[in-house]
Amino acid sequence: MDKAWKQRERQVAKYFGGQRTPLSGGNGKISRADVIHDTLFVECKLRKKHTAITLWDETNEMAKKEKKTPVIALCEKGRPGFWVMVHSDDLDKI
């Protein structure tokens, strides 16, 4: 049976229409990404807890009360632009 992180990498690869990189990203001969894809460089991180996901959980609770889709914009001082965090189940809603 695969380890949990390998299963997650396969799940993410399938979602994006790619394939899990054998031997994991760092050791891969094709790409250093965790997922082999024509245009995306996908890195997967399976952790017990992610700070950004804790923030998403809090935002999701507030969004549910207003019947809205939660979206988080992560910004860093001194860096232009922002990163968008949306749950994979919600991507088709935005």
Regions found by a protein language model. Give the residues of each.
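Catalytic phosphate/metal-binding cores of nucleic-acid and nucleotide-processing enzymes, i.e., regions
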Residues: 1-94
